Regions:
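Bacterial Sec-dependent N-terminal signal peptides
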Residues: 1-29
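N-terminal amphipathic/hydrophobic interface segments
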Residues: 21-553
Length: 553
């Protein structure tokens, strides 16, 4: 049909529609009973199928109809509450023009299409192709599927395959969730909507900005396949591959996503976040960076979190970095985790005093590491089976076979407490079987101090003083001003104190029950130059931070 003919027909439809409202039907404007469908056999040769194989568009009911013929084509013009069917597809409208020759349809006003399912489409204007069941809906278009409502100004809908597309902007509303985009495709079979170009999702708690997003109106699952941001309060998630279930508040993210909050930042190859429970699991080169005054990072192959309890649980070669101005403290172990001191449910050895009321909430934190603990900083290194570090009392507790190295000093005992001030070692206490060894430059000789308990004090990261009490025993190599050996002193006392200068013993003080003597080195057997239990373990000492974990590589 040419444009002039179409205009004339549409104008005639308009006049007919007006007449139907104010006059009784005339001879050319026949009333039709709603209960009795009418098909003119002189206009439609085959009441079942057309030449192109498409099913016949059948008339069901209307208030009036007109028969038109133009350009060798036949038209039925229906006005008033029109109902038409093609197979199981029902079409409704105020006015419909049926081209019986081409099996096409144009509709005006209150258009409604349903294919005997839960998907309904509405519009002010419709052009429908019966051969392939394609509907072109325009003006105030709405599509509903029982869960979501999609609105746009222009929708091309494949009724047979239940696929609709828009390219001039659209909006989907599902409960309190609103999605908008410039383009989109609706898939009725799966209830998925693929949004493209300038996509935004809003609900009560979240905002998502992306360029491509697939959303399921039933499951409320949003899938990302392009750079996307999920904004929830102060938290921003950046990802390019993953999904977010709006209803369940669960995210599964891949391809090195990032979580950035006001107090922390997370990066990992894969993330599984459950906001309903406040939990998360971060897999593959996971990095947690705190933004509070504590200032620590946690690296691991796997990190589990509980935001409500402020818990981090790291496995797969975890590494903890406690940041300092000039000297970061690195801690590695088989397992590392952190939580609140105030939430501890069971006693930690010697740590009950840490569970009291803590005024500064940033200090209400502990770090625990167990099995194969290794520590490295420029000024101090250590190893133990387990570690407990409380920020509330600034104490690092090394438990089970602990050993500490500081410059040329090695210290061992049953349990070692390291007290930290401003993130630097301030004091060290050794409980039971304390043994300190100091290597003398490049020689084969060692100063030694042994006792029941031992205390050491630090200045600027170096040991300035040692004191042992209870069955104290000491071997000390005396040097002259030219660093030449004068002799060796082997003594016992109740208390022995050693002061250090330039990381070397400078003065020894004995208190109570002193016994011992000074002898030339050459007159003492080598076996007697070492206190019983002597064990120099320099080969176990971490030389650099690279010795702690493969994560550094």
């Amino acid at each position: 049909m040419n444009r002039i003919g179409l205009f004339i027909l549409c104008f005639a439809l308009f006049i007919t529609h007006v007449k139907a409202q104010i006059h009784k039907p005339t001879e050319s404007s026949k009333p039709i009973a709603n209960s009795k469908p009418v098909v003119d056999s002189t206009l439609i040769a085959n009441p079942v199928t057309l030449e192109n194989g498409g099913k016949l568009i059948e008339f069901l009911s209307a208030e009036t109809y007109n028969v038109k013929k133009m350009d060798s084509m036949d038209f039925l013009v229906f006005v008033g509450h029109v109902q038409i069917r093609q197979g199981k597809t029902l079409l409704f409208g105020d006015s419909l023009i049926l081209n019986t020759t081409k099996n096409t349809l144009e509709g005006f006003g209150h258009i409604h299409i349903n294919d005997a399912d839960s998907v309904h489409t509405y519009a002010d204007y419709l052009k429908y192709i019966g051969a392939n069941k394609k509907a072109f809906l325009r003006k105030k278009v709405k599509l509903t599927d029982g869960k979501g409502i999609l609105t746009t100004d222009s929708l091309d809908y494949d009724v047979a395959n239940k696929i609709g597309s828009f390219i001039k902007g659209g909006k989907l509303v599902r409960d309190k969730t609103i999605l908008t985009s410039k383009e989109g495709i609706y898939y009725g079979e799966t209830r998925d909507v693929l949004f493209k170009k300038k996509v935004e999702l809003h609900d009560v708690e979240n905002r998502i900005i992306t360029d491509t997003l697939k959303y399921n109106t039933y499951s409320q699952l949003a899938n990302f396949s392009s750079p996307s941001k999920i904004i929830t309060g102060s938290r921003i998630i950046s990802t390019s591959n993953g999904n977010f279930n709006i209803g369940l508040k669960k995210s599964n993210l891949y391809d090195r996503s990032t979580v950035d909050d006001s107090t922390y930042k997370f990066v990992a190859d894969e993330m599984n976040i459950d906001d309903s429970l406040g939990t998360g699991e971060f897999k593959g080169n996971a990095i947690y960076q705190s933004k509070d005054t504590v200032g620590f990072d946690l690296w691991a192959g796997n990190i589990k979190t509980n935001k409500l309890k402020s818990i981090l649980f790291a496995t797969e070669q975890p590494l903890l970095l406690i940041k300092q101005k000039k000297d970061t403290l690195y801690i590695a172990a088989d397992t590392l985790h952190t939580g609140k001191i105030s939430d501890l449910s069971k006693a930690i050895p010697k740590a009950r005093d840490s569970v009291g009321k803590i005024k500064d909430t940033t200090l209400d934190k502990y770090f625990e590491a167990y099995h194969h603990v290794r520590i490295y900083s420029d000024s101090l290194q250590a190893k133990a089976d387990s570690l407990f570090y409380s920020l509330s009392d600034s104490t690092i507790r090394l438990i089970t076979n602990p050993i500490v190295w500081a410059n040329e000093n090695q210290i061992t005992g049953d349990t070692i407490y390291l007290y930290v001030k401003n993130k630097k070692p301030e004091q060290l206490n050794v409980f039971d079987n304390a043994f300190a060894i100091n290597k003398i430059d490049t020689t084969e000789y060692f100063n030694q101090l042994k006792g029941n308990k031992l205390n050491a004090w630090f200045e600027n990261g170096s040991i300035s003083k040692m004191r042992t009490k209870g069955n104290a025993e000491n071997i000390y190599f005396a040097l002259d001003n030219d660093k030449k050996f004068i002799g060796v002193n082997h003594s016992n006392a109740q208390i022995i104190e050693i002061t250090f200068e330039n990381n070397e013993p400078a003065k020894v003080i004995f208190r109570n029950q002193l016994t011992g003597n000074m002898s030339p080195i050459g007159k003492i057997p080598k076996a007697d130059l070492k206190i019983r239990g002597f064990k120099w373990q320099e080969t176990r000492r971490p030389k650099t931070k690279l010795d702690l974990s493969p994560n550094f590589h």
